[in-house]
Amino acid sequence: GSRRIIKKLKERDGICIDTVSEALETLVVAGCKELIVQPTYVIHGYEYDELVEILREYLNQFESVRLGHPLLHQQSDYKELICGLNEVFDFRSSSDAFVFMGHGTGHFANACYPALEHQIQAQGFTNVWIGTVEGYPEITDVKEKLEQLSCQKAVLAPLMLVAGDHARNDMAGEDEDSWKNILERGGIEADCMIAGLGSYAFVQRMFAEHALQAEEIR
């Protein structure tokens, strides 16, 4: 994912961004001794595992290497995310459904998405649902639930750090298989909010806290 985007930015816009390995090489040359890495992933998926493996290759190049956790790591993270999202969207202010688009993955960490939905609903926000682009639940699963509840309107928003291609095309795009059009074909009016999680101050604070709590890799 990230390497493909780095390549595209360089070819299309002439913008050069280091890969993780390139950034680490730069820090080694600069003589850095202590390294703290804070990824901006939502879950502990394949890319997080890959990052750990890359960092392990550099353990002998630094005196210490510490790694922060993704957004959703421990139980308090789920509570903080739900509280923050409710402050942004005010779930009880409307009878409309709120549907969040997660990335999804074939990694077992995909379980974070249904777990998040379960905890949101357990807090009484029974009009809030989580779907994913590449995992479970899919938009068809969410649509089925909304139809069972005779829902007529839904607000769609990304559960991703950046509102990029998935949010603009897979969620809000004009293609017939966009989430917006899938819902509207089912008689559910869909209103899309194109803002990534990274634009919210409370999410930025969560990542800053995770960086402060970064654990040493051995």
Give, region by region, the residue ranges found by the protein language model.
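Active-site-proximal alpha-helix that buttresses catalytic centers in soluble enzyme cores
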Residues: 1-218
